[in-house]
Curated annotation (Swiss-Prot):
Classification of source organism: Eukaryota, Metazoa, Chordata, Craniata, Vertebrata
Binding site residues for Zn(2+): 315, 317, 320, 345
Name this protein carries in UniProt: Queuine tRNA-ribosyltransferase catalytic subunit 1
Protein family membership: Belongs to the queuine tRNA-ribosyltransferase family.
Location in or out of the cell: Cytoplasm; Mitochondrion outer membrane
Keywords associated with the record: Cytoplasm, Glycosyltransferase, Membrane, Metal-binding, Mitochondrion, Mitochondrion outer membrane, Transferase, tRNA processing, Zinc
Pfam families: TGT
Gene: qtrt1
Source organism per UniProt: Danio rerio (Zebrafish)
InterPro entries the record matches: TGT (IPR004803), TGT-like_sf (IPR036511), tRNA_ribo_trans-like (IPR002616)
Annotated function: Catalytic subunit of the queuine tRNA-ribosyltransferase (TGT) that catalyzes the base-exchange of a guanine (G) residue with queuine (Q) at position 34 (anticodon wobble position) in tRNAs with GU(N) anticodons (tRNA-Asp, -Asn, -His and -Tyr), resulting in the hypermodified nucleoside queuosine (7-(((4,5-cis-dihydroxy-2-cyclopenten-1-yl)amino)methyl)-7-deazaguanosine). Catalysis occurs through a double-displacement mechanism. The nucleophile active site attacks the C1' of nucleotide 34 to detach the guanine base from the RNA, forming a covalent enzyme-RNA intermediate.
One Gene Ontology biological process: tRNA-guanine transglycosylation
Length: 400
């Protein structure tokens, strides 16, 4: 039986380390938040404007989703923080009884790069809705998130694409540290809302270390690893992840932003990450792609027209209990309900994967789980991604 270790953290968040892998950096924790406890490692589905695309709040709760995301930038535009505050925050507005994490709006510096300009004051966006210019400062980002009432808030950071090099990366890192201090000062609800810092520094190890050194001086409830998953080489990606977890405090949660592919999740748990989010499972569902332990099924393809198996015979989600691949294939031709059913399955797959990862850590068999996972995901070991093999070897998990 794994030993239970109690670790204190700043209220209103508490992190209890339930078990640690004796070989790698993987760990299973219980994260106490205002609306419920969150078991980690955890995958968090993303709802841009207060809802998941293709799934309701009740259905998410039925899948035992303990925490999901909302987007501060888009919610700040539509329907606006004043209206949401009148509905008793985003929880009341979307009738969600579990935890919410809101991002800061900073990622839109990359995703809407042609519509934005960054200065020390903040980031100026040209609204994609009406073309008006909007200045988002650290103070305004926190004010919006205070109105939304999320359980975890993210600092506004200066985000640059992971493929950018040169002085802009260093500028963004130092500015993110300064903006963190402004966000901390602006938070009106430190007793109810947890503000996470976001580590920046691009693919430069020295800049990452400098950011880690400065940000960990601040007594924030948790830390996110930002600026990755944006098209950089996977060899660079995993090295920045493990460098970050090496320097982050053991007693605080570690959130790797924007990561959602199954292999990436498993490898990055091994590297010491606790929390993940990505639009991938919902976005790919809209194109008819269903996630399975051996990869994905493209249900629009003709080969599934007469296939009466569920998406995954071992899956217990509502979609797999009721519908066949053939039915979903046929539904795609005439009804958007197919996307809805596949979205439910894909989110269930991600949540179930993380529950299995967690249980393997508690049972002290995480390295064995990783080997079994990789064998099922890839037809042969020769097809294992070299970056994943190297990353796992760095934490003493050998796949050969």
């Amino acid at each position: 039986m794994a030993s239970v270790k109690a670790v204190s953290s700043a209220a209103p968040l508490a992190l209890r380390i339930v078990a640690e892998c004796p070989v790698s950096k993987a760990r299973a924790c219980s994260l106490t938040l205002p609306h419920c406890a969150v078991n980690t490692p955890v995958f968090m589905p993303v709802g841009t404007q207060g809802t998941m695309k293709g799934i309701t709040a009740d259905q998410l709760e039925d899948l035992d989703c303990q925490i999901c995301l909302g987007n501060t930038y888009h919610l700040g535009m539509r329907p606006g923080p004043d209206l949401i505050e009148k509905a008793n925050g985003l929880h009341g507005f979307m009738k969600w009884r579990r935890n919410l994490l809101t991002d800061s709006g900073g990622f839109q510096m990359v995703s809407l790069v042609e519509l934005s300009e960054v200065t020390e004051e903040g980031v100026t966006f040209r609204s994609p809705y009406d073309g008006k210019e909007i200045l988002l400062t650290p103070e305004q980002s926190i004010a919006i998130q205070n109105s939304l009432g999320s359980d975890i808030m993210m600092q506004l950071d200066d985000v640059v694409s992971s493929t950018v090099k040169g002085p802009r990366v260093e500028e963004a890192m130092h500015r993110s540290v300064r903006w963190l201090d402004r966000c901390i000062a602006a938070n009106k609800n430190p007793d109810r809302q947890n503000l996470f810092a976001i580590i920046q520094g691009g693919l430069d190890a020295e800049l990452r270390k400098a950011c880690l050194k400065e940000m960990t001086k601040r007594d924030v409830p948790g830390f996110a690893i930002g600026g990755l998953g944006g098209g950089e080489e996977k060899d660079d990606f995993w090295k920045m992840v493990t460098l970050s977890t090496d320097h982050l405090p053991r007693e605080k949660p570690r959130y790797l932003m924007g990561v959602g592919y199954a292999v990436d999740l498993v490898v990055c748990v091994a590297l010491g990450c606790d929390m993940f989010d990505c639009v991938f499972p919902t976005r790919t569902a809209r194109f008819g792609s269903a996630l399975v332990p051996w990869g994905s099924l493209q249900l629009k393809q003709k080969q599934y027209a007469k296939d009466f198996q569920p998406i995954d015979p071992d899956c217990q989600c509502p979609t797999c209990r009721r519908h066949s691949r053939a039915y979903l294939h046929a539904l795609f031709k005439s009804d958007t309900a197919a996307m809805h059913h596949i979205t439910i399955h894909n989110i269930s797959y991600q949540l179930s994967l993380m529950r299995s990862v967690r249980q393997s850590i508690i049972d002290q068999r995480f390295p064995e789980f990783v080997k079994e996972f990789m064998k099922r995901m890839f037809p042969s070991s020769s097809q294992y991604p070299s970056w994943a093999v190297e990353a796992l070897q760095s934490v003493n998990i050998c796949l050969s």
